[in-house]
């Protein structure tokens, strides 16, 4: 922009201030992004009147500069037409259904703020943004000319003025604002251009051309930019929503052959105009684009804010040490900023938004430094959408007065602002600023703002996806339209799953013996997770070394700056002694350039399909892909590729900002060109060409420089003249003497840094302190800039050209020793210590901030009389959060660190201060000029003691000038970005070095060391001494050595004697051990077979139920004698059902029980013989608790058998299994309606409420009312629900489970707040749990509080949160739940009231006619794993159940909806029907982490029982490693009795504490009902366990884990595993 434009901008700002209105554009950007206190510099409150009109030529120039241009590239039209718009065809009329729409939209709020309210209308400031409404289309879209002419020109100019704003935003009625957007309808233009047009489409939006007051068009242009103009395009088909179609109209069905894509073009950074500046200079003599906080005041004496003060006025002020003359010498009379405050505050100067295209961009601020500063300056870099960072300000040398603070900004990727903060400390703080500039921020031409073209894909249900998510073989839309027929219509190669052939992939010239790529189905058993065809190559049939190449179709060039990606799945199965590469070949002009984008080299593949997404960067021409596989001898592998797709973003999306990308593609070492006329198979001989030359390395030296200052450019040019190095040496600032080097290629490099040695002392010239070496491995990318400072050796004290000093060196002058003898210290004759060695630094720049990679510390200087046995260990730091400080200085200087400041001349400087070496101590220079300076790299200067070495943390120097105290070495550093290859070692005796070379990966070698043969370019592994390389080239074997041969007779005699002796000793030992063990086993067996031995301690005492008053039955004492003893002879065990909390659970029969049929089917719970006393107490306690109850809704205890071992508890056999599994199994599904109705769920809830009422009336608190603890008599009609698990009540009954601070696991999701917060348990606790049980019943078995952990449930419930009703849950039922969940216990109803309300629900037609929710997905395990606590968590490690795998049920899988996403690695098993499961025992997965519920069956007739008993003589023994037990497995016959049909009515429940069931209901229970399974249960065989095997079962809670307080849960059973467990015998469950 010329001077006229700048003058116009200045007049525009003046007019905005004078008129008191504007667009609110801070810093001239037109977006109002400044701070709330922002104000333009030099904008007076009042100003002179301006001319009412401006020249036409000036107005036209200004209008052109303030326009907003939208340019859509012509390639977008070409690609959209070819990919999305198939030509019209009468045979395929669907192609004509595609529509193209377009519009240009602006927000009305900024435009209306500019105009102000119209006459008669008043709206508040917050109402300037009208409520959203249907966007209005302007009737006058185009200005001048015809549509035909504009189409021919492919350019549209839209002028926006007050009338258009009022028409589009306010409407015809000015009393009411109706539109939130102002839109131009461009559908006709865009539709013509996308189908028939040529070239690019350009749309220019500018202020209306009218003569008006100065600044009017500028304000209007700023308002237009603030309204965020954006261009919207849409290509859609019939049935899709449109940009302009009303949402209330019904849409026709979607077209599966038409796209629904949307594009939005807008400025990447709307707050930046195209006039964004790349530099700024403000001397405060004229108005500047700066903002202030607090605002600037030119008039008055505002002590709390900035003021612009002329220099002549400052000379008249009575300011303490204030500035009297202006810093700019070229202007004798000028102005500067002044701040005079007495408060502790922070004042800020903020720059406008800037950009930088140069690494040399810096901030320069001229301030006045006072003798006694009372504040400090801090600079902040504030990039867009990034956190700010501090800019290091370096002042010019000087004590006080005007000085320039400079800080490096660099080249930030995003636009940025710079804030200069002055932090005052009170006491009349004074600040003066004369100059504020951003310099050297432009490099070449400055690009304008970038328009981003963002694309999206809209699903049929309205879900919006990024365009890159479409056609990527991952279904994101609900109906899969993003992966449907649309993708199959793309050109060949864009979307390829190889189901219809090669998809455009082809091979070169094939011979009969050459391997070839094939499209086939993989039949290997290990890769059956993939179905369908794939592009595969087999190396099994090719014994020799070979290669194979397959080439894709040719793809057009992607859009410039597009996020282009390649997606593919690949697999390597077997042993591949070679590599596979994916090469991108770009068709450059006259040649083809190839580069590798993906590479894998492996010995043995994982045999798993892997998904890879590869960015395709910097592709500017047509390209194709090549898959190249090479293998050597011994390869037996299958290489396969599938689901290869090119993202549509490559051709239909444009990123707004042209990012300064380096090579961010995957590691690519091969970059070559070939002639298109040559053999089109360039990769056949690539194995013979080295990927890189391992002998090439880059050695960086000091370039011949020495002393405290680094080398110059001329020195390094001369030093590296005949080498492969090319460096740039800094000449000023902190980078002076630092060499910069660009990485030639993306690769892994080893960087060896060597610090410089320290100087020698005057008397000890035999040994110096060595520099430290550090070697690290780093991944570097092509174009990365490394900054390398090579440390220089500290200066030696001797020899010297000074004669007096030379005499001291050779021992002819002993003045130093004399002073030491007299004063015991050195002061007058100080000197003679060596300077500290400089450190070697290798670092990078990230956003202008140095980031260290490797720092090799320098050695400390030796003292004048240093001892020879001094040793300083190496120190290494790898934490960048540790401050890199300078070493402590005394008479000698400490070493320089990474980032610190020092004012001592003899101290070494830190890297950010320039890293120069320190001078000698002043006394040494003054007395005899003994100069022992520190080396470049932060070495400290010497005195009589040695100087400290440089490093990340500088080495310390002696504090008292001890002539025997050496300077300490610095601290080395390696970045966490790298890998430390060798530890820090002191090795360097001179100057430092840096050696960079390619790192050869030797991880496949046994010794992790290898080298590459320079002739054959093969990697050869090294072996340790005494071993040689095996034939496989990887392993090391001991080298065979010839041994002396002994006579054969002697060898035979020795071997025979040794064998006989060994056999005799072994036989004797076996006999002795066997006899001893046999005697021990006999004694133990006799002792264990005595029942009195185990019951002696139990018979002498009784168990009191008064431990917990809540469990007391009228305070009576219960003993073993109260239990009904059943003789062992009357008990017959039929088969094993599973493993319970104490031991095995069996199905059995008992006879001779009064008032019961004989034989009676029962469940027998066993207690193994070898048990702890605590287990016996638990076993008996549970028997006592269950025996106390006598109710039809509580599982009945038939009796016990305790007089013989093992001990038994006989319980009522429940064939229906647990309630939770029943609900989950009977969920209705689309192809499987449920046999349940809402009335069935109410009856189940009624049964459980009856049992709870009985417990409540007997003052018994269950504490764990949950669906998993309720059992059903049968799964069919007539079922009765009963409470069947009192494990938790048993533990609380024992008064040890709820001990404070223990490892107890509580059912948190079923507990009220007072229970888990205060430990209060009442009958209202069971009321709360019953409400959760109701939620489980009516959600059909879902886990309460879905997706919440126990901790989250605690916080949710205590904060007042409650669960939402389950799907299709009737309102009256949910009201019962909410009443049970009242926070105050007294507000919860008792079970009599709950029963009454459930009864009402059973009579309500609206409730019982409610349909159950339908499950549309496969059943997924949403249960949480419930770890349990053993009795002694400190002594017993957690034992987890690991049951054997069950066999899959044979038969075809039923039709099911598509699977839902799941994180479980297991697969859902087929769910058998009830008829199929009758008469067989099944196993289900551990869905509740240790609570695997029992399933019982009563379908075995008497004849079947005799068959089972008669077949015990031929068992098949199976060892169960989980429980250490033997099971006897025997196949059984399936008996499928028909289920009795019909639904029996339920009787009314009593309200007096006991619930009765009518006789007809009891008689209707199905005794032979089929077995109910877990949701994913598998079929298993019946098992029978002889009684004598029960003695060897372990006891205790072996299948429960526990958790120490504060530790995470351990995993339980593996997915898909199964086990048995008795729901009656479970220990207290977890949530």
From Swiss-Prot:
Catalytic activity: L-tyrosyl-[protein] + ATP = O-phospho-L-tyrosyl-[protein] + ADP + H(+)
Record field: compositional bias (Gly residues): 21-39
Predominant cellular place of this UniProt entry's protein: membrane
Function: Neuronal receptor tyrosine kinase that is essentially and transiently expressed in specific regions of the central and peripheral nervous systems and plays an important role in the genesis and differentiation of the nervous system. Also acts as a key thinness protein involved in the resistance to weight gain: in hypothalamic neurons, controls energy expenditure acting as a negative regulator of white adipose tissue lipolysis and sympathetic tone to fine-tune energy homeostasis.
GO molecular function, one term: ATP binding
The protein's assembly and partners: Homodimer; homodimerizes following heparin- and ligand-binding. Interacts with CBL, IRS1, PIK3R1 and PLCG1. Interacts with FRS2 and SHC1. Interacts with PTN and MDK.
SUPFAM superfamilies: Concanavalin A-like lectins/glucanases, LDL receptor-like module, Protein kinase-like (PK-like)
Transmembrane segments: 1054-1074
Residues the record lists as binding ATP: 1137-1145, 1165
Superkingdom field: Eukaryota
This protein's encoding gene: ALK
Positions of the MAM domain: 280-443, 494-652
Family annotation (SMART domains): LDLa, MAM, TyrKc
Keywords: ATP-binding, Cell membrane, Disulfide bond, Glycoprotein, Kinase, Membrane, Nucleotide-binding, Phosphoprotein, Receptor, Repeat, Signal, Transferase, Transmembrane, Transmembrane helix, Tyrosine-protein kinase
Record: glycosylation sites: 185, 260, 301, 340, 427, 440, 461, 579, 587, 643, 724, 823, 878-879, 901, 1001
Biological-process GO terms, alphabetical: adult behavior; cell surface receptor protein tyrosine kinase signaling pathway; energy homeostasis; hippocampus development; negative regulation of lipid catabolic process; positive regulation of dendrite development; regulation of cell population proliferation; regulation of dopamine receptor signaling pathway
Region (Disordered): 20-53, 1423-1493, 1526-1554, 1609-1631
Protein name, UniProt field: ALK tyrosine kinase receptor
Protein's organism: Canis lupus familiaris (Dog)
An annotated GO cellular component: plasma membrane
Active site residues per record: 1264 (proton acceptor)
Extracellular compartment spans: 19-1053
Subcellular location: Cell membrane
Cytoplasmic-facing ranges: 1075-1631
């Amino acid at each position: 922009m010329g001077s006229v434009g700048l003058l116009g901008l200045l007049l525009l700002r003046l007019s905005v201030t004078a008129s008191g209105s504007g667009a609110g554009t801070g810093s001239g950007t037109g977006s109002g992004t400044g701070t709330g206190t922002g104000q333009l510099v030099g904008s007076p409150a009042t100003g002179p009147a301006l001319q009412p009109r401006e020249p036409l030529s000036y107005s036209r120039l200004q209008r052109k500069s303030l326009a907003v241009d939208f340019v859509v590239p012509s390639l977008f039209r070409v690609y959209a037409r070819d990919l999305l718009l198939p030509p019209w065809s009468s045979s395929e009329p669907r192609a004509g259904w595609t529509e193209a729409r377009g519009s240009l939209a602006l927000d009305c709020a900024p435009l209306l703020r500019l105009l102000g309210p119209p006459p008669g209308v008043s709206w508040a400031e917050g109402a300037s943004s009208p409520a959203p409404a249907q966007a209005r289309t302007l009737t006058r879209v185009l200005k001048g000319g015809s549509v035909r002419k504009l189409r021919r020109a492919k350019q549209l100019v839209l002028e926006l003025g007050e009338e258009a704003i009022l028409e589009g935003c306010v409407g015809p009625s000015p009393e009411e604002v109706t539109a939130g957007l102002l839109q131009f309808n461009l559908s006709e233009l865009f539709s013509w251009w996308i189908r028939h047009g040529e070239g690019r489409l350009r749309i220019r939006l500018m202020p209306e051309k009218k003569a008006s007051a100065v600044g009017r068009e500028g304000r209007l242009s700023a308002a237009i930019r603030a309204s965020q103009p954006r261009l919207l395009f849409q290509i859609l088909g019939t049935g899709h929503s449109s940009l302009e179609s009303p949402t209330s109209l019904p849409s026709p069905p979607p077209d599966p052959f038409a796209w629904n894509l949307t594009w939005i073009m807008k400025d990447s950074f709307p707050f930046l105009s195209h006039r964004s500046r790349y530099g700024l200079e403000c001397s405060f003599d004229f108005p500047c684009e700066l903002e202030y906080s607090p605002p600037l005041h030119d008039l008055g004496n505002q002590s709390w804010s900035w003021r612009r003060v002329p220099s002549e006025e400052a000379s008249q002020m009575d300011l303490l040490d204030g500035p009297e003359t202006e810093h700019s010498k070229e202007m004798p009379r000028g102005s500067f900023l002044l701040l005079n405050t007495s408060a502790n505050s922070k004042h800020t100067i903020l720059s406008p938004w800037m950009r930088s295209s140069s690494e040399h961009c810096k901030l320069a601020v001229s301030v006045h430094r006072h003798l006694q500063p009372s504040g400090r300056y801090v600079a902040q870099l504030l990039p867009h959408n990034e956190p700010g960072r501090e800019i290091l300000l370096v002042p010019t040398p000087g004590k006080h007065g005007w000085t320039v603070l400079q800080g490096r900004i660099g080249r930030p990727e995003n636009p940025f602002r710079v804030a200069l903060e002055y932090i005052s400390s009170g006491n009349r703080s004074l600040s003066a600023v004369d100059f504020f500039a951003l310099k050297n921020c432009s490099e070449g031409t400055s690009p304008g703002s970038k328009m981003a073209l963002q694309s999206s894909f809209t699903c049929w249900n309205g879900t919006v996806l990024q365009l890159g998510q479409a056609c990527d073989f991952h279904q994101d839309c609900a109906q899969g339209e993003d992966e449907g027929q649309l993708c199959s219509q793309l050109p060949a190669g864009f979307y390829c799953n190889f189901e219809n052939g090669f998809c455009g992939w082809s091979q070169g010239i094939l011979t009969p013996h050459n391997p070839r790529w094939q499209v086939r189905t993989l039949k290997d058993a290990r890769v059956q997770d993939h179905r369908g065809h794939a592009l595969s190559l087999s190396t099994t049939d090719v014994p020799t070394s070979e290669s194979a190449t397959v080439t894709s179709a040719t793809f057009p060039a992607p859009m410039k700056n597009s996020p282009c990606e390649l997606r593919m799945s690949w697999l390597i199965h077997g042993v591949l002694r070679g590599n596979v590469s994916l090469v991108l070949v770009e068709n450059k002009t006259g040649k083809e350039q190839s580069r590798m984008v993906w590479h894998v080299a492996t010995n043995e593949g994982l045999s798993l399909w892997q998904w890879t997404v590869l960015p395709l960067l910097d592709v500017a021409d047509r390209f194709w892909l090549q898959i190249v596989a090479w293998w050597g001898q011994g390869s037996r592998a299958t290489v396969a590729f599938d689901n290869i797709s090119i993202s549509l973003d490559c051709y239909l999306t444009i990123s707004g900002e042209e990012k300064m990308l380096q090579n961010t593609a995957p590691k690519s070492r091969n970059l070559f060109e070939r002639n298109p006329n040559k053999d089109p198979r360039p990769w056949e001989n690539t194995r013979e060409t080295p990927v890189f030359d391992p002998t090439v390395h880059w050695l960086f030296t000091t370039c011949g420089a020495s002393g405290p200052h680094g080398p110059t450019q001329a020195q390094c040019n001369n030093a590296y003249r005949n080498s492969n190095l090319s460096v740039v040496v800094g000449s000023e600032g902190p980078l002076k003497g630092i060499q910069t080097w660009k990485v030639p290629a993306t690769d892994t490099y080893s960087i060896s840094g060597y610090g410089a040695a320290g100087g020698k002392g005057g008397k000890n010239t035999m040994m110096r302190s060595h520099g430290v070496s550090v070697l690290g491995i780093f991944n570097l990318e092509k174009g990365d800039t490394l900054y390398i400072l090579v440390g220089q050796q500290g200066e030696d004290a001797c020899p010297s050209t000074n004669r007096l000093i030379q005499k001291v060196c050779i021992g002819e002058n002993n003045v130093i020793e004399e002073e030491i003898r007299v004063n015991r210290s050195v002061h007058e004759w100080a000197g003679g210590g060596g300077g500290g060695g400089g450190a070697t630094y290798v670092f990078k720049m990230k956003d202008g901030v140095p980031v260290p990679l490797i720092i090799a510390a320098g050695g400390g200087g030796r003292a004048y009389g240093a001892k020879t046995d001094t040793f300083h260990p190496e120190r290494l730091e790898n934490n960048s959060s540790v401050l890199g400080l300078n070493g402590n200085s005394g008479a000698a200087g400490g070493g320089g660190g990474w980032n610190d400041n020092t004012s001592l001349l003899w101290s070494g400087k830190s890297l950010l201060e320039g890293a120069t070496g320190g001078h000698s101590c002043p006394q040494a220079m003054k007395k005899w000029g003994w100069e022992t300076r520190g080396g470049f790299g932060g070495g400290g200067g010497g005195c009589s003691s040695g100087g400290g070495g440089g490093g990340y943390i500088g080495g310390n120097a002696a504090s008292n000038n001890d002539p025997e105290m050496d300077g300490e070495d610095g601290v080395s550093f390696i970045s966490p970005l790298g890998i430390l290859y060798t530890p820090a070692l002191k090795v360097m005796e001179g100057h430092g070095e840096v050696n960079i070379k390619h790192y050869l990966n030797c991880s496949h070698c046994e010794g992790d060391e290898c080298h590459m043969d320079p002739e054959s370019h093969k990697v050869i592994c090294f072996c340790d001494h005494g071993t040689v390389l095996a034939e496989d080239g990887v392993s090391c074997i001991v080298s065979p050595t010839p041994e002396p041969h002994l006579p054969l007779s002697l060898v035979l005699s020795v071997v025979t004697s040794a064998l006989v002796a060994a056999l005799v000793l072994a036989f004797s030992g076996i006999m002795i051990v066997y006899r001893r063990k046999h005697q021990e086993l006999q004694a133990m067996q006799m002792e264990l077979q005595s029942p009195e031995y185990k019951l002696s301690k139990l018979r002498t005492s009784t168990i009191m139920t008064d431990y917990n008053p809540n469990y007391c039955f009228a305070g009576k004492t219960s003993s073993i004698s109260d239990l009904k003893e059943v003789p062992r002879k009357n008990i017959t065990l039929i088969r094993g059902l599973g493993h319970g909390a104490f031991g095995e659970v069996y199905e059995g029969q008992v006879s001779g029980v009064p008032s019961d049929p004989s034989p009676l089917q029962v469940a027998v719970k066993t207690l193994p013989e070898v048990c702890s006393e605590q287990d016996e107490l638990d076993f008996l306690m549970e028997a006592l608790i269950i025996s106390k109850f006598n109710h039809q809704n509580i599982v009945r205890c038939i009796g016990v058998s305790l007089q013989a071992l093992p001990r038994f508890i006989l319980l009522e056999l429940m064939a229906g299994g647990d309630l939770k599994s029943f609900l989950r199994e009977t969920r209705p599904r689309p192809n499987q309606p449920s046999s349940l109705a809402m009335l069935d769920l109410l009856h189940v809830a009624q049964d459980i409420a009856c049992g709870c009422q009985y417990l409540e009336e007997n003052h018994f608190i269950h504490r764990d009312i949950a669906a998993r603890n309720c059992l059903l008599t049968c799964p069919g009609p007539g079922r009765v629900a009963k409470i069947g698990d009192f494990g938790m009540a048993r533990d609380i009954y024992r008064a040890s489970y709820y001990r404070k601070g223990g490892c107890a696991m509580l059912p948190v999701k079923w507990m009220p707040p007072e229970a888990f917060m205060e430990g209060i348990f009442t009958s209202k606790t069971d009321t709360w749990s019953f409400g959760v049980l109701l939620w489980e019943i009516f959600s059909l078995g879902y886990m309460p509080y879905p997706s919440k952990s126990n901790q989250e449930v605690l916080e949710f419930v205590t904060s007042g949160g409650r669960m939402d009703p389950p799907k299709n849950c009737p309102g009256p039922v949910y009201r019962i739940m909410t009443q049970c969940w009242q926070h105050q216990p007294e507000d919860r109803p008792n079970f009599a009231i709950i029963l009454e309300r459930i009864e009402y629900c059973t009579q309500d037609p609206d409730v019982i006619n409610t349909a159950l929710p339908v499950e549309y997905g496969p059943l997924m395990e949403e249960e949480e794993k419930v770890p349990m606590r053993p009795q002694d968590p400190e002594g017993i490690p957690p034992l987890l159940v690991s049951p054997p795998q069950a066999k899959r049920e044979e038969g075809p899988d039923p039709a099911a909806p598509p699977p839902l996403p799941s994180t479980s690695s297991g697969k859902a098993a087929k769910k058998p029907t009830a008829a199929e499961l009758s008469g067989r025992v099944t196993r289900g997965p551990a869905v509740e982490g240790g609570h695997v519920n029992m399933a019982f069956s009563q379908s075995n007739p008497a004849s079947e029982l005799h068959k089972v008993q008669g077949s015990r003589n031929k068992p098949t023994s199976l060892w169960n490693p989980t429980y250490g037990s033997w099971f006897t497995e025997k196949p059984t016959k399936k008996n499928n009795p028909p289920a009795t049909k019909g639904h029996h009515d339920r009787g009314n429940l009593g309200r007096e504490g006991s619930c009765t069931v009518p006789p007809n209901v009891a008689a209707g229970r199905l005794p032979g009902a089929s077995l109910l399974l877990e949701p994913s249960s598998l079929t298993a065989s019946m098992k029978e366990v002889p009684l004598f095997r029960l003695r060897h079962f372990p006891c205790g809670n072996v299948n429960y884990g526990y958790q120490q307080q504060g530790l995470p849960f351990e995993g339980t059973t593996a997915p898909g595993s199964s086990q048995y467990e008795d729901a009656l015998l479970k220990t207290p469950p977890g949530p």
